Structure formats: C-alpha cells, structure tokens
Amino acid sequence: MVATPSATTGLQVAQDYVIADINQAEFGRKELDIAETEMPGLMALREKYGTEKPLKGARIAGSLHMTIQTACLIETLVELGAEVRWASCNIFSTQDHAAAAMAARDIPVFAVKGETLEEYWEYTHRILEWGDGGSPNMILDDGGDATGLVMLGSKAEQDITVLDNPGNEEETFLFASIKKKLAQDPTFYSRTKAQIQGVTEETTTGVARLYKMQKSGELPFPAINVNDSVTKSKFDNLYGCRESLVDSIKRATDVMVAGKQALVMGYGDVGKGSAQSLRGLGATVCIAEVDPICALQAAMEGYRVVRLEDVVEDMDIFVTATGNYQVIRNEHLLKMKDEAIVCNIGHFDNEIDVASLKDYEWENIKPQVDHITLPSGNRIILLAEGRLVNLGCATGHPSFVMSNSFTNQVLAQIELFTKGNEYGKEVYVLPKHLDEMVARLHLDRIGAKLTELSKDQADYINVPVEGPFKPDHYRY
C-alpha cells in the first residue's frame, strides 16, 4: 500500500491506515523480531492454531496501546485467521515504528504518538468501519473506549441530548465525533452493536465499565474479563509496573530516585508493583489507600500508610495508581514542594486534576515532560500530562510479561468467537485450566521446571494430576 503525506498534518495517510512515518517499518520489524523471542505464549498459540485458524471470519476492532508487543499480538490474531483494524487506546502510547511495521503488512492501523483528542476519536471510529460497508464482529478493548463508543453512539441515535453536556475536554471531542458520525450515518452505531459477538477487555478500568453495564442490564453481548486472569493481573499489573514505572520516571527526568520520598496512591496490583520499583531504587515509599485490606498489606510490607493531605508538602514523587478520579486535586498540587514529580500509572488521565493547572505557566521540557509554575513560585514536573506515564514517557511493560496478558487475550477471542452462543450477556473470566496453560507456556523461557504430582499425591489433595491445582476462589 502506498502512503502519501497529508498536506495538513504531514502524517502518512493512506486509504486504510494513518501512521507517523512508513519509513520506520524496518526498525519496527527488527524490534518485533526481538520481542517474539520474549513472547513464548503467543508463539505457542501460532504453532498450535496456525493451521486450524479458529479466528477465520473474525473481524476484530482492536483498541489497545500500539506498541511492539501489541504488534506481536496483532500478527498472532492475523495468523489465526482474523481480520484486524487497530487504534491505540491512549494518545501518547503509540510506538510509531510499531505502527509502521503493521501498516507495511497492509494491516489497517490508526495510531500516532501524540495524536490530538480529535484524532483519537476519529481513529477509534476507523476501527469500526470496514471497507465493504460491514462491521466488526469482535472487540478487543483496553479501557473500554471502543465498547463505550458503540454504546454511547447507540444511545445518541435514540436521544441526541445525551451528548449535550460534556463533563471534560475528552468528552467534548468524543461527543463531537459521535454527532459528526450520526450526521453521516444515523444508524451506524446500532448496526455495529448488533454485529458484535463479544468483547475481551484488558484492564481494570475497562472491566469496571463492563460490570457496570451488566449490573444495569445494558450489556448487549458477552464479555470476557481478561484483566482478572491470574496470569494477567498478578503478572502484567504487578511485575510489569515494577519495571516500567521507574523506567519512565528516569527517562523523563534523569533524577536520582534513591533518597527521595515517594507517595504511591493505591495499593492494588499496579500500586504494589509501583511501590516495589521505587523502593528498589532506594526511595522512601509511603502508601495512600482507602481499602483497609490493601492498607494493611502495605503496612505489613513495611510501608508507611498515610493520607495525602498530611504529607503532600514533603513528597518528592507522586504516583497515582487507583483507577479513580480527582485523586490529586488542585488544593494538593498547590502545596507541593519545588521540583516535585507528579505522574499517573492508572489507565485514564483524570486521577490528577490536570485541568486545574491550565491557567498556570507551563514550560515544555521535552515531549510529555512539563514544568508548571504554581502561584507559590514552586515548579512541579508533570509527566505525560497526567496520562499513563509508563507508555507516555517510556515503552510500557517488557515483552515477556505482556506475552502472559496477550496470550489470555487471544484465548478469550477464540473462546467468544467460536463458542459465543454458549455465553449470555454477562462478564466472564477464562477458566482456571487456561490460566494455568498460559503460565505453563512461559516457564521454559526462564528455565523453570515443574515438579509433577504422583497419582497418590493428586488423589490426596483431590486434584487432577495435570491440574487445575487450585479452586477458583484461591487468591494467589
């Protein structure tokens, strides 16, 4: 496919992809070749299902960070028979060479690092539009934006007033993009929704949206909660963040973490990994939590459990990892010390009240790193404009841990596409034996050797010799 520069943006635009620079495709392919050696789960699925092609006929609309690791996921889906259209789920998370590598294979991808919010929603629409006028029949989501777009658009077809009062800048662009689409095609969203056989969701915040729809009876198709597979949440969320958080802070600021005081807000799996990473480089780490169980866990690990308002003037580094909104508000930002570093590793950009800083003086240091001068004269360093710091200021999680997550995604897509009529309009998790299979596929790469139960031992603890080894309620 031939790409030509847009006269208005300079981006590479073709009939069926929008990327920054097709000339980066060779670089992307070289990095993808390395990533494949670190993604044994995906490679095993290609070998197992490549001939069978269980996803033949699947049209997957993918909304997930367009990274090198995601490129490996995309190529696995294609190898298994799927047609794929892809956009990033964050305006800063795209790796342009990864997007170029996909475009060079004629895989429709719409993702540019640093795209505007207007472009973001335009690109998310593009993954729902098949060239033959058809629709996707599967969604692979991260954060729920693709699913949410279909659902909100369907509501707007019936009542356009749902788009009247945007609550923030992002909703302003989202609502405008839906109105624009409805003017072109008044039944686009309901037709698309009717074709969807299922959705697989990658992350905590997107899963919360699905459960909310299920509770209200609005979920129109089955969904698989990939996030709560043990081999996703206990690995990607924990060990991935343990490596990628400090990587992003160091790349963005070059500061010495040792000796700094850091506050991690939220002590779920992401917060646990984040706290470990900062402590590992010598920071004194405190935790802010609302959940008494998580707070007790943090205390038992030796962290001080504090309230933000009690320590805000003392901290050097602030990390939000809650999945909630307005966690760090303007009154907190105004009290921060000079050169405090503020960042977010939760999925959405509303954990930090960045909008309240817009009236202050901003100095851009480099992409996704801004100095903001407060009324007190102190300057804070805001990373990635409050969006995902590990993908905005670095390259996200390492390939190996993402292989765990993405192997779950492929299995979930196969499950819903081939057996969708066996599922109701509810949110499901993958069965335990598949979770254990994902783990098993990754052991050899790191030299781990499993001990095997004898028949007598298996009978004694009442499990099959080959597993599953734990009941569904086991917490790991």
UniProtKB/Swiss-Prot annotation:
Known cofactor(s): NAD(+)
Major location category of this protein: cytoplasm
CDD domains (UniProt xref): SAHH
GO BP term, pick one: L-homocysteine biosynthetic process
Entry note: cofactor: Binds 1 NAD(+) per subunit.
Reaction(s) the record says it catalyses: S-adenosyl-L-homocysteine + H2O = L-homocysteine + adenosine
Pfam hit, one: AdoHcyase_NAD
Swiss-Prot/TrEMBL keywords: Cytoplasm, Hydrolase, NAD, One-carbon metabolism
Catalytic EC class: hydrolase
MF annotations from Gene Ontology: adenosylhomocysteinase activity
Entry GO terms, CC: cytosol
Top-rank lineage group of the source organism: Bacteria
Subcellular location(s) of the protein: Cytoplasm
InterPro entries according to UniProt: Adenosylhomocyst_ase-like_sf, Adenosylhomocysteinase-like, Ado_hCys_hydrolase_NAD-bd, NAD(P)-bd_dom_sf, S-Ado-L-homoCys_hydrolase_CS
Residue numbers binding substrate: 67, 142, 202, 232, 236
EC number: 3.13.2.1
PROSITE patterns, sorted: ADOHCYASE_1 (PS00738), ADOHCYASE_2 (PS00739)
Pathway field: Amino-acid biosynthesis; L-homocysteine biosynthesis; L-homocysteine from S-adenosyl-L-homocysteine: step 1/1
Binding site for NAD(+): 203-205, 237, 266-271, 289, 324, 345-347, 390
Family to which the UniProt record says this protein belongs: Belongs to the adenosylhomocysteinase family.
Function: May play a key role in the regulation of the intracellular concentration of adenosylhomocysteine.
Protein name per Swiss-Prot or TrEMBL: Adenosylhomocysteinase
Gene label: ahcY
